């Protein structure tokens, strides 16, 4: 078995802390962010309950490239999105997973290293 070292680009290194702070590379955030194609956007919604299918539709329809997967990091505890959101994302051929933010950050790095097109919505 051949083992090779895999270097993670600093720009795609994700870290999460329990103090309500997200760290992406050298930048820190204390609000909901959307990580999309290497760019971070701050999202005005403050709770997961405020997300609805129209928000995802508007982001997807204005994007140059749609992801294979959207990772939802729901903060310290795992929460789930409304089933209507799952139906909309499925109609676009996009998978999604909800998990706590620390797990979402680790999963995002792994999927990126596999070359998968992945977006993330992360609550600190």
Where are these regions (language model features)?
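Binuclear metal-ion centers of metallo-dependent hydrolases, dominated by the metallo-beta-lactamase
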Residues: 104-111, 116
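Non-catalytic interface/targeting segments
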Residues: 1-54, 58, 113-124
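Beta-hairpin (beta-strand-turn-beta-strand) motif
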Residues: 74-77, 101-102, 123-124
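A short glycine-rich beta-strand->turn/loop micro-motif centered on a GG-aromatic cluster
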Residues: 95-105
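CheY-like receiver
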Residues: 59-62, 107
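Mid-chain, well-packed structural core segment of small domains
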Residues: 62-97
